[in-house]
Regions:
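Charge-rich, low-complexity amphipathic helices
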Residues: 28-30, 38, 78-82, 86, ...
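Generic structural hydrophobic/aromatic packing signal, biased to beta-strands
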Residues: 3, 20, 103, 179-181, ...
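C-terminal, charged low-complexity interaction regions
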Residues: 121-240
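An N-terminal structural lobe/cap that precedes and organizes the functional/catalytic core
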Residues: 1-69
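Short, low-complexity, polar/charged sequence segments that are solvent-exposed and flexible
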Residues: 34-37, 75-78, 199-200, 207-211
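Catalytic cores of phosphodiester-bond-cleaving enzymes
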Residues: 45-118
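Short N-terminal signal/transit or membrane-insertion segments
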Residues: 1, 21, 30, 110-126, ...
Length: 240
């Protein structure tokens, strides 16, 4: 495979081994993979170092470092304050656009290796406008980007890691339009389509225990509050 950002015309350094899901969001040295072409039938535990693919050149891979670091900060905050110290109140401030671009990059990575199509593993070629939004100072049309989905988070059943499901636009022959994803039990959506997605997402219904028809969905939220009657409030402030 070629670098999926080659459309920019500035590739350099040859193809590098890119973690298709940022290694910084994980705590250990091993992960459980499932749904990819080589583990489509049952979960397989692999080393974190093995969860890579040559899908980006060295230059473009390295330019994602600030986005990966922002996602790692969120992952560590959730692990430390939901799992390890649930009783205390805690707050973190993150850069919203960096987190959004990390989510969009992960969506494009997974699409490029066929990870958004667990049945046929068809590969998704990144759209040029999305690639330019990631690497250049262009603005994405409103509606494209990160959404937060409300729902319960429990330290008793807390999971470190990332899970995802593709979102398909049935009015466009089932074309992949984004993905739902859960990072350390907090639910998000990244949309690749223009226009408000809240009503479209509500029509998804029940997916992996999350009822999108009842959840509240917020585009580019400024504050995410994890509330509890028995634990301290955790607040994620996003600067946009």
């Amino acid at each position: 495979m070629d670098c999926w950002a080659a459309v920019l015309g500035d590739c350099a350094g040859g193809l590098s081994r890119e973690h298709y899901i940022s290694d910084g969001i994980f705590d250990g040295e091993a992960i459980t993979a499932y749904g990819l072409e080589w583990c489509k039938d049952h979960p397989i535990q692999i080393s974190l170092a093995s969860a890579v693919s040559k899908i980006l050149c060295k230059r473009h891979n390295e330019r994602f470092s600030p986005f990966d670091a922002e996602a790692a900060k969120l992952s560590r905050f959730l692990s430390a304050n939901v799992l390890d110290d649930p009783l205390s109140e805690a707050q973190i401030t993150l850069r919203g656009y960096r987190l959004e671009k990390w989510a969009l990059k992960t969506f494009l990575n997974l699409g490029y290796i066929g990870g958004l199509d667990p049945e046929h593993h068809a590969r998704l070629k990144p759209r040029e406008d999305l690639v330019r939004y990631l690497f250049q100072e262009t603005q994405a049309p409103k509606g494209i980007g990160l959404y937060f989905v409300t729902g319960a988070v429990s330290n008793a059943k807390f999971n470190v890691g990332l899970s995802w499901n593709a979102i398909r636009n049935l009015s466009r022959d089932g074309a992949i339009a984004g993905m739902t994803f859960t990072l350390n039990d907090v639910r998000f959506v990244v949309s690749a389509e223009e226009g408000p997605a809240e009503h479209r997402l509500a029509k998804i219904g029940l997916v992996n225990g999350v009822d999108y028809s009842r959840a509240k969905i917020y585009y580019r939220p400024h504050n995410i509050a994890l509330l509890s009657k028995t634990a301290g409030q955790k607040t994620i402030a996003l600067e946009w």
